[in-house]
């Protein structure tokens, strides 16, 4: 990529950036449009998952596609493979754009296939449910046919080197440490005599637990850019975890399992996301109990998607990391539940067991069936290990401890099981580390996205103070819907 980085305002402003997805003011539906020299590309195209209704999410996701004019998109650059960052990409093909290039870090196509295929299945099921309820006919956002079309256009590129995509665009992926193969993206836009560099952080590693996430590459910092478009998920000062919280939560998990599964011979449900969180929790359980020959409690992995993704991990990992993964998956206590019949049989068996089932927010998947069995039983426990939106079923259960019943799919269930909520398993960078990292980058502006309003306000205040203390003139900007950035 020819040309040196040019300071903002010194050349004709030919590059325009607009955060048009849900990440402008929230934490799902990440999508950024970059217009330059008559061309349009996207950084990520994720699904909105904030709405409490199927129809609400459907409309929100259609609205994103309507804003970007799908047939004009030449390229989508992906940072990592969580659905809220990649889930709408096949919808471009459903809207008639069959030529769009999809750029992704090396070794991630297997994960993309599973995530998109699962989403297509859910899309079709949800639209069938909507069509049964009303007179209007809804079509799926996309189907498996569009998934297959999208996969043919995926281009994997190496991590760590600047790769020329075409005469105007180059990319360097740098490990973000958030999940397996997740990357920050340094996007170079070449204008001939000069080059502009934009750093998209996507989601960043929780530095406090990265030594325990043995299947994920370690975070590496980027040192410079013209501008940074950075996440702020945990930008709030209050609630940012400390090292001691992590070990306390780990011991709490151990105590809960010993009490409910070993002493009382009952069940512990751990609702968890299929990608990244599932192998992390299985590894934690293996570290806690795997060497104890007297520990005979079955550990069920009840999620078709999670089981397929574990197979992807097996094909992607290598060296010492692959050895650790194989050791974990060879643990005699692990039982992989695949078929619906086996899942139903496991649910009907009230004996001692640990159940790791997706999804983590109890929005879909087999965890919903499990919670229907667990929730009314005061001898069982539901152990939450991740964030849950307040309007999701998991959020309603977390915040409904005083309620006698919880409605699940329109039916009331007694609210009697023990609830334990662990907060230190987040894979996102925490407030203090966000300030430290963004302060270290030599750039002209930092634009804060992917966080609620209060998180962005508090992070902006503290980052500005830290920048001032080290005599840096970097500006910090809170992005809102409609914010346009010119370079």
Where is each model-derived feature located?
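Hard-cation-handling environments
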Residues: 252-393, 407, 449
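Short acidic-hydrophobic, aromatic-tinged amphipathic segments that line or gate anion-handling sites
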Residues: 152-159, 335-340, 478
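Short, solvent-exposed amphipathic alpha-helical segments in soluble enzyme
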Residues: 34-37, 188-190, 215-219, 284-291, ...
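Short acidic, glycine/proline-enriched helix-loop-strand junctions
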Residues: 455-482
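Generic long, charged, amphipathic alpha-helical segments
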Residues: 406-436
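His/Asp/Glu-rich metal-coordinating catalytic cores
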Residues: 9-77, 82, 86, 91-280, ...
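A short, acidic, amphipathic alpha-helical segment used as a generic capping/interface helix at domain edges
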Residues: 365-371, 426-441
């Amino acid at each position: 990529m020819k040309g040196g980085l040019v300071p903002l305002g010194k050349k004709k402003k030919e590059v325009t950036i607009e955060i048009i997805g849900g990440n402008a003011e929230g934490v799902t539906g990440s999508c950024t449009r970059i217009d330059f020299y008559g061309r349009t590309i996207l950084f990520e195209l994720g699904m909105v998952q904030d709405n409490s209704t199927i129809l609400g999410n459907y409309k929100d996701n259609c609205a994103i596609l309507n804003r970007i004019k799908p047939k004009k998109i030449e390229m989508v650059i992906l940072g990592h493979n969580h659905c809220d960052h990649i889930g709408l990409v096949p919808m471009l093909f459903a809207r008639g754009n069959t030529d769009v290039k999809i750029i992704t870090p090396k070794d991630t196509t297997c994960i993309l296939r599973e995530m998109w295929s699962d989403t297509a299945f859910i899309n079709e099921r949800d639209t069938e449910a909507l069509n049964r309820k009303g007179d209007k006919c809804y079509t799926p956002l996309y189907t498996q046919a569009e998934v297959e079309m999208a996969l043919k256009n995926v281009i994997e590129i190496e991590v760590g080197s600047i790769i020329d995509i075409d005469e105007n665009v180059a990319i360097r992926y740098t490990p973000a440490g958030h999940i397996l193969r997740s990357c920050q993206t340094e996007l170079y836009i070449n204008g001939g005599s000069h080059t502009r560099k934009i750093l998209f952080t996507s989601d960043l590693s929780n530095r406090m637990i990265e030594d325990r996430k043995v299947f994920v590459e370690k975070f590496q910092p980027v040192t410079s850019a013209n501008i940074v478009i950075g996440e702020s998920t945990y930008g709030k000062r209050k609630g940012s975890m400390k090292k001691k919280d992590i070990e306390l939560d780990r011991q709490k998990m151990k105590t809960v399992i010993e009490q409910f599964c070993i002493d009382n011979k009952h069940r512990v449900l751990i609702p968890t996301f299929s990608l990244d969180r599932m192998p992390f929790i299985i590894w934690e359980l293996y570290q806690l109990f795997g060497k104890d020959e007297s520990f005979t409690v079955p550990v069920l992995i009840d999620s078709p998607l999670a089981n397929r993704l574990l197979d992807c991990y097996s094909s992607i990992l290598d060296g010492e990391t692959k050895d650790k993964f194989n050791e974990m998956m060879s643990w005699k206590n692990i039982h992989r539940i695949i078929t619906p019949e086996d899942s139903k049989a496991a649910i009907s068996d009230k004996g001692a067991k640990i159940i790791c089932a997706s999804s983590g927010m109890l929005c879909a998947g087999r965890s919903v069936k499990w919670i229907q069995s667990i929730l009314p039983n005061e001898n069982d426990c539901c152990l939450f290990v991740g964030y849950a939106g307040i309007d999701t079923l998991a959020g309603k259960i977390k915040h409904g401890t005083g309620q006698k019943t919880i409605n699940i799919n329109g039916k009331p269930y007694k609210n009697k099981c023990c609830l334990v909520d662990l907060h230190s398993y987040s894979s996102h960078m925490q407030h203090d580390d966000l300030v430290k990292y963004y302060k270290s980058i030599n750039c002209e502006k930092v634009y804060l996205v992917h966080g609620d309003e209060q998180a962005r306000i508090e992070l902006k205040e503290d980052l500005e103070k830290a920048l001032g203390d080290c005599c840096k003139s970097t500006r910090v900007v809170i992005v809102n819907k409609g914010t346009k950035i010119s370079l």
